[in-house]
Curated annotation (Swiss-Prot):
Record gene name: nuoD
Membrane topology (UniProt): Peripheral membrane protein
Official protein name in the record: NADH-quinone oxidoreductase subunit D
Protein species of origin: Cutibacterium acnes (strain DSM 16379 / KPA171202) (Propionibacterium acnes)
Family: Belongs to the complex I 49 kDa subunit family.
GO molecular function, one term: NAD binding
GO annotation, cellular component aspect: plasma membrane
């Protein structure tokens, strides 16, 4: 039997850092960067010790947006858990929904029972979400460097994607559309035409962002050689996503550990070899193009599966009524409500029971990982055989990746902290949860 070890980690706060600097007698300055600063990507606090304009020490302070999501899920049904998960990383919310539902389906043993159309719809919505998340990352990153045109184009194109999300799910954000067993609703009648037009628009306007970034001498000067983190650093700290692929390692869970039939889609893993901020931005630009390739294949598969089920047939999991919010802000049709609530007493009783009490999940635990917009997004669920999780945990890539910020910034200039942080693109809702 191995020996028990006790590991202690000592942090520090403002008073401690000031006292340490005073004892050393260094002519250094300790400054607070955030948490109320527009370049911290949310309520993040960086405690920076400066020797002139050089960063000699940097510590990351998080927890300002902690809302107890994981604990709250222990008091909600498995279906209601989606509503909490979608509010973690609110920029790339569909990935949270997907990884949670895949984990629940693995516990239920129904992974292979999810209809093909539901799997395609999941790929479609998450790849659109990947594009919109990268548009925010590149746009805000450019804005922080003074390139406001990049932000204008990014927000403009993201707005088109949000409008499509609203047409499909009824909401622009916090959708809770992906459910255990499939998706809540199918595409609207004009959904395929809207997706087709959206793909054409992305093909036309996404290269516009690349024109502002790829060969812009100011953008390159502010990002090349900045925030250096090589492969050994990323592996030691568990960094994934664009930051890891910027070291030249083609690690993408859609290829290495396929889910949702990603092994049947034709796309390439974007890599770079500079290990710096510029490489991470270039990878995001390339990944948006690859997502468009995947969306084209989704469009073809959605045309072939039109009219098929989008939820498992098991009545213990699927709701008898597809109660959902439409893009007009209204609910389902009167005919649909009449069928569930006025014609079948058994359907009404079953619907009431499965919505209020929920379904039971066999006892056990599971870990499911997918390739989110920022890296490996994992969900660890523990079930005691009841109608709600015994324990839930989310491995948010932003939480792990932001721990590499001191390694990137210490020894560099203060002005390089902002592009280094922007290249990681942490979303504090996911970091703090």
């Amino acid at each position: 039997m191995s020996e028990n070890h006790e590991y202690l980690s000592q942090g520090g706060d403002w008073a401690q850092i000031v006292d340490e600097a005073a004892e050393r007698g260094d002519e250094t300055v300790v400054v607070n960067f955030g948490p109320s600063h527009p370049s911290t990507h949310g309520v993040m606090r960086l405690i920076i010790e400066l020797d002139g304009e050089s960063v000699s020490d940097l510590r990351v302070g998080i927890g300002f947006l902690h809302t107890g999501i994981e604990k709250n899920m222990e008091f909600r049904t498995w279906t209601q858990g989606v509503t909490f998960m979608t509010r973690c990383n609110y920029v790339a919310n569909f990935f949270n929904e997907l990884v949670y539902c895949l984990a629940v389906e693995k516990l239920l043993g129904i992974t292979d029972d999810v209809p093909e159309r539901a799997r395609v719809l999941r790929v479609m919505i998450t790849e659109l979400n990947r594009i919109s998340s990268h548009l925010i990352a590149v746009g805000t990153g450019g804005l922080e460097l003074g390139a406001s045109s990049v932000a204008e184009v990014g927000l403009r194109e993201r707005e088109i994607i949000l409008e499509f999300n609203q047409a499909v799910t009824g909401l622009r954000m916090n959708n809770a559309w992906i459910r255990p067993g499939g998706v809540a609703t199918d595409l609207p009648e004009t959904g395929l035409d809207q997706l087709r037009d959206l793909i054409k628009r992305m093909e036309k306007y996404l290269p516009e962002i690349g024109q502002f970034c790829n060969e812009n001498p100011i953008f390159k000067a502010r990002t090349q050689g900045i925030g250096y983190a090589d492969l050994s650093t990323c592996m030691a700290l568990g960094v994934t996503g664009p930051a890891l692929r910027a070291t030249g390692l083609p690690w993408d869970l859609r290829k290495t550990q396929p889910y949702c039939d990603y092994d049947t889609y034709d796309f390439d893993v974007a890599t770079w070899d500079t290990c710096d901020c510029y490489g991470r931005f270039r990878i995001r630009l390339e990944e948006m193009d690859q997502s468009v390739r995947i969306l084209k294949q989704c469009l073809k598969r959605l045309e072939d599966t039109q009219g098929d089920r989008h939820m498992v047939e098991d009545p213990h999991i699927a709701w008898p009524a597809e109660l959902a919010l439409g893009p007009d802000g209204q609910g389902n049709s009167n005919e649909h409500i009449r069928h569930i609530m006025g014609e079948s007493m058994e359907a009404l009783i079953h619907h009431f029971k499965i919505v209020t009490e929920g379904f039971r999940v066999p006892a056990g635990q599971v870990y499911q990982a997918i390739e989110g917009a920022g890296g490996e997004l994992g969900c660890h669920l523990v079930s005691d055989g009841g109608v709600r999780p015994y324990r839930s945990h989310l491995r948010d890539p932003g939480f792990v990746n932001v721990q590499s910020l001191p390694a990137m910034c210490e020894g560099g200039m203060l002005s390089d902290v902002v592009p280094s942080l922007a290249s990681l693109d942490p979303v504090m809702g996911g970091v703090d949860r």
